[in-house]
């Protein structure tokens, strides 16, 4: 669950980047995208705090969380600039530069999420190897104990034979009769 959750975080961080660029392109073409803006806002909140609805886990990584706080602030600034674009047009605003700045922050956030996910996957792989080694060791111990039990059973048969048979004649002795 947790590894899949971190992979979803990486995907959504990339989705924020791509969706925002699409929003800017469409807004600059005078096609308002309030629905997409709301989606990106909810994606950012999900990336910061986790979201059951989006099936996003909250990454416990300080660098990622700091970058997401920065990204959230930058998106709020970008939304204000989008409102300005709707009023005066894209050529009278700083929307392109702000969009580029936002893209760079998204890139960094996506990279941090990917690095975190890779660290988690590496730890999981190590734990899987330890578990496999433990299983092999347990099977070896069980096999060793089985071998010892078979040795003891064989020795027991030999001793029972010695206890109940006369060695000189091979016939049952008095212990067998009692």
What residue spans do the PLM features occupy?
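Juxtamembrane amphipathic/coiled-coil helical coupling segments that flank
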Residues: 90-130
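Conserved nucleotide-binding and Mg2+-coordinating catalytic segments in signaling enzymes
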Residues: 159-178
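Heptad-repeat coiled-coil alpha-helices
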Residues: 29-32, 46-49, 84, 115-118, ...
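Selective recognition of signaling/oligomerization transmembrane alpha-helices
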Residues: 117-160
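Primarily heptad-repeat coiled-coil rod domains in cytosolic scaffolding/tethering proteins
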Residues: 4-7, 11-14, 59, 66, ...
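N-terminal extracytoplasmic segments of bacterial inner-membrane proteins
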Residues: 3-45, 73-84
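Heptad-repeat alpha-helical coiled-coil/4-helix-bundle sensor or tether segments in soluble regions
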Residues: 37-92
């Amino acid at each position: 669950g947790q590894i899949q959750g971190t992979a979803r975080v990486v995907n959504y961080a990339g989705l924020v980047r791509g969706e925002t660029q699409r929003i800017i392109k469409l807004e600059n073409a005078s096609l308002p995208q309030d629905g997409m803006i709301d989606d990106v806002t909810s994606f950012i909140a999900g990336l910061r705090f986790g979201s059951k609805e989006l099936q996003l886990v909250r990454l416990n990584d300080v660098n990622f969380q700091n970058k997401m706080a920065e990204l959230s602030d930058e998106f709020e600034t970008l939304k204000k600039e989008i409102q300005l674009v709707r009023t005066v047009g894209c050529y009278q605003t700083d929307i392109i530069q702000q969009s580029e700045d936002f893209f760079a922050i998204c890139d960094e956030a996506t990279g941090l999420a990917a690095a975190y996910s890779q660290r988690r996957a590496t730890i999981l792989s190590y734990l899987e190897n330890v578990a496999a080694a433990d299983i092999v060791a347990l099977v070896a111990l069980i096999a060793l104990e089985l071998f010892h039990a078979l040795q003891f059973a064989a020795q027991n048969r030999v001793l029972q034979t010695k206890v109940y048979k006369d060695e000189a004649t091979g016939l049952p002795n008095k212990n067998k009769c009692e």
